[in-house]
Design a protein with these regions (language model features):
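Extreme N-terminal leader/targeting segments of oxidoreductases
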Residues: 1-49, 64-68
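Core beta-strand elements of the Rossmann-like FAD/NAD(P) dinucleotide-binding domain
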Residues: 45-47, 199-209
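Conserved FAD-binding catalytic core of PHBH/FMO-like flavoproteins
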Residues: 128, 162, 209, 213-321
């Protein structure tokens, strides 16, 4: 495939505009557009729950509701999971997320495809400065799930789509509407009105509860006047998803200062299908088109693994990131979830895993309220419980980002002393 003509740095909170750069690419499923009754009958449909966004957060919530037998509609502007032809995106899933997926019925699929790991090593130059083995910690055996599984995000999203269909066979289900873009929204007292554009025209639906899981570039922030706190960083990275033909790496390694990358940071993770995800920190003024060229990436790989390394590049592309957090997890009928609520740097696997926890927190509460088994006030606890988690994740990842690229003298001195 040819390189994308748009090679700008993009936010790590990936959106449907995240462009394929170059490489063999990933093969993703495609789901057909099925015209809903509202479009065919030219009427306004009414639904208790509408989820906007079919990424890992929205699909996790949809699966949780389907398991509880709560009817809902999920709208996504694409016709596939992941991002068409794009990268592995989130890859590291924690024990807590895996426990949730066990309850939802997809853990076994994840375990078969993904890679379990518990050992990590961190280097500064050629010196190992830190290591851990989570299996050695006393809390490890308290769960049936492993400490971590690495797997490309689109696989989990695909398993969630499968599971939602399975759960809908014998109980009220969640309707997945692909190629359906929300173009307008307004609050109307006890409900909200959404306008949806499709390949066959537009229609409207009413919802008692709207969940915005569209990601960091959501239009709902502007529609609702949501207040956000955050900043954009100038750290630049390049992802390379690589399949080695000879002498692959053996462990998860992190370099705070990698001698083969101009003493900048490097992450090295094994994912499903024997594909390695390698993240290279770039200079702040790097040209994204230059750093993601195949010949440049191969030269970088040779510096790391030796000139005789043989590998296929599955995907490569540049990214930047910012951090931000909403002040309210709920405004009126709308709940913010996942990257819509907070955007964090990728360090510590706190993006997708937090969205999964958001979804699990809200699913049972929505089910209880929709069924009339709990008062509406129960939904207020979503903000109380999940905002603190979002703020904490932004704080922790910002601290990590400052350590990886200190810009102030005090931060530089602290890093030198720590290493």
């Amino acid at each position: 495939m040819n390189p994308s003509s748009d090679s700008r740095y993009v936010d790590v909170a990936y959106t449907n505009g995240y462009e394929f750069t170059q490489g063999l690419g990933y093969s993703l499923p495609q789901y057909p557009f099925i015209a809903p009754e509202e479009l065919l009958d030219k009427r306004v449909g009414k639904h208790p729950v509408v989820i906007v966004g079919g990424g890992i957060t929205g699909l996790t919530l949809a699966c949780g509701l389907a398991k509880l037998g709560v009817p809902a509609v999920l709208l996504d502007e694409d016709n596939t999971v992941g991002v068409k032809g794009a990268s592995s995106r989130g890859i590291c899933y924690t024990q807590k997320s895996l426990e949730i997926f066990q309850r939802y019925g997809i853990f076994d699929r994840i375990a078969r495809k993904g890679v379990e790991w518990s050992v990590g090593r961190t280097f500064a130059g050629h010196d190992e400065v830190f290591s851990f083995d989570l299996k050695a910690q006393s809390s490890f055996n308290l769960s049936q799930q492993p400490a971590f599984i690495n797997i490309q995000q689109f696989y989990i999203e695909g398993y969630l789509v499968e599971r939602i269909a399975e759960l809908g066979r014998d109980r009220p289900g969640v309707e997945l509407r692909w190629s359906s873009r929300v173009t307008a929204f307004e609050q109307q007292g006890p409900s909200a009105l959404l306008t949806i554009q499709t390949p066959q025209g537009s229609y409207q639906i009413e919802a008692q509860h709207v969940i915005d899981a569209t990601g960091s570039h959501t239009p709902f922030h502007a529609w609702l006047g949501a207040e956000l706190e955050g900043k954009r960083g100038d750290d630049r990275w390049c992802i390379a998803d690589v399949k080695f033909k000879t002498t692959p790496p053996t462990e998860r390694h992190t370099w705070i200062e990698a001698p083969f990358n101009e003493n900048r940071a490097v992450w090295q993770h094994l994912m499903g299908d024997e594909v390695w995800r390698i993240d290279y920190q770039m200079a702040p003024n790097s040209d994204p088109a230059q750093v993601s060229r195949e010949d440049v990436v191969r030269e970088r790989l040779q510096r790391q693994f030796g000139h005789d390394v043989q590998c296929d590049i599955v995907w490569v592309g540049p990214y930047a990131y910012r951090s931000q957090c909403v002040r309210q997890m709920r405004i009126g009928r709308v709940f913010f979830m996942g990257d819509t609520a907070k955007v964090v740097s990728p360090f510590g696997a706190r993006g997708g895993n937090t969205g999964i926890a958001d979804a699990d927190n809200l699913a049972w509460k929505l089910a209880a309220v929709v069924r009339g088994r709990a008062p509406e006030s129960l939904l207020h606890t979503y903000h109380d419980e999940r905002l603190e988690a979002a703020q904490r994740n932004v704080q922790v990842t910002n601290r990590t980002a400052r350590f990886l690229r200190p810009t102030e003298p005090a931060a530089q001195l602290f890093r030198q002393a720590a290493l």
